[in-house]
A protein has these predicted regions:
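Acidic, metal/ion-coordinating pockets
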Residues: 22-378
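Sec-dependent signal peptide recognition
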Residues: 1-7
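C-terminal motif of bacterial Sec signal peptides marking the signal peptidase cleavage site
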Residues: 10-12
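Bacterial signal peptide processing site
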Residues: 14-17
């Protein structure tokens, strides 16, 4: 859904470790947070509002997917629209759709590269926008590769496409978060990556949001103090290929969720679906991948969730999650397309979709017991 971006609403958010001493005294809007307690919400007098949020996993363009984008775009230049289009019916209906750009953008003439460099073409931003994404997290363990130039190129391309970037910046006083007004609701999107697994940009440690749990709570509190009614956190963290969150992941998200500062945590980083958990009313959903072309013998890395969470306003003005649903999406490297594991007729369900559902249902079982709805293939 398209929305009204709030160009100047919040002061820059950064973890204490990511900030450098300012050359002059800070203004009140830039002062350091001293309390991690969210401000009380005012009592709501008008009709109670709702917001549906779509969250999905990593977009990581390998050379084979780049080849499909070149073929799809033809003489008009590379296009990623067709590669992402399979998930559009899940993304477009949401009020606010969140994606994760795992790699930075190279210049248009530069190569799309494989591990360990991982750059992609800025045309990806257009594809992201056209399938319905409103904001993208950009903080990951690959953000630093092209330095400030690459961060600027990535964020500029997303903004030009109408997508709000979050998680990285080229100047220390710029915002690290995205702030948008959606259906009259002010939404802040914070993106961060695990500092233990994500190198800082040389000479610019403030460029990527590498905050700890305490730092992220402070950022969320600051966002609320500056007017955000809903705060969404995208967190890149986890062990690659693991089907379960690590102890560090669990500790981090538990502390953040219990703080009451955020409404939803969208996790990615392991490249596999790792389940979900509702902690003190806050859903934490580890999404897996959206679009990628990983190892052929690793089917779990070609699966992801597109989750839809309904946040409903309460009489006190706060928002709580009342519904959560996940749809399984398969990345098909050979065709360069996405397939949703959901059909009107069971005769249409493929063996691959049945396998993906069985594996995902096992991982999601605790979340299903908490009320999470996993869409069946038919």
């Amino acid at each position: 859904m398209r929305f009204l971006p709030l160009v100047v609403v919040l002061a820059a958010c950064a973890s204490p470790a990511a900030q450098t001493p300012p050359p002059a005294p800070q203004s009140p809007r830039e002062s350091t947070i001293t309390s991690a307690s969210p401000s009380p919400s005012p009592t709501r007098t008008g009709p109670l509002r709702t917001l549906t949020v779509s969250g999905s996993g990593d977009i990581l363009i390998h050379p084979s997917l780049w080849g499909h984008a070149q073929a799809d775009g033809g003489a008009g230049g590379p296009s990623f629209v067709q590669e992402l289009a399979g998930a559009q019916p899940l993304i477009k209906p949401a009020d606010y759709a969140v994606c994760h750009v795992e790699q930075g953008f190279n210049n248009p003439a530069g190569p799309v590269t494989e591990y360990p460099n991982y750059y992609t073409h800025p045309a990806l931003a257009t594809g992201i926008a056209k399938v319905g994404f409103d904001t993208c997290s950009t903080a990951s363990n690959w953000t630093f590769l092209k330095g400030l130039e690459g961060i600027g190129r990535t964020n500029d391309a997303l903004r030009q496409a109408g997508v709000s970037p979050a998680g990285s910046r080229t100047k220390p006083r710029q915002d690290l978060l995205a702030v948008d007004e959606v259906n009259g609701i002010v939404v802040a999107h914070i993106s961060a990556t695990d500092p233990a697994d994500s190198p800082a940009v040389p000479d610019a440690p403030w460029a990527i949001n590498r905050a700890t749990a305490d730092g992220l709570i402070d950022q969320a509190v600051k966002a609320r103090d500056d007017g955000a009614e809903i705060v969404i956190l995208s967190l890149a963290m986890g062990q690659m290929g693991s089907s379960a969150p690590t102890a560090a992941q669990r500790k981090t998200v538990s502390k953040i969720a219990k703080s009451g500062a955020v409404n939803l945590i969208i996790g990615h980083g392991s490249h596999t679906i790792q389940g979900a958990e509702k902690i003190d009313g806050v859903w934490v959903i580890w999404q897996g991948n959206l679009l990628t072309s990983f190892f052929p013998d690793q089917p779990r890395m070609h699966e992801g969730l597109v989750s839809t969470v309904t946040l409903a306003e309460q009489p006190d003005g706060g928002f709580v999650a009342t519904k959560a649903r996940g749809d399984i999406v398969l990345s098909l490297p050979q065709s360069g397309r996405l397939a949703v594991a959901g059909h009107q007729s069971c005769d249409q369900v493929t063996a691959r979709e049945q396998e993906a559902y069985a594996a995902t249902a096992e991982v999601m079982e605790p979340a299903i017991e908490q009320g999470f709805k996993l869409t069946k293939p038919c």
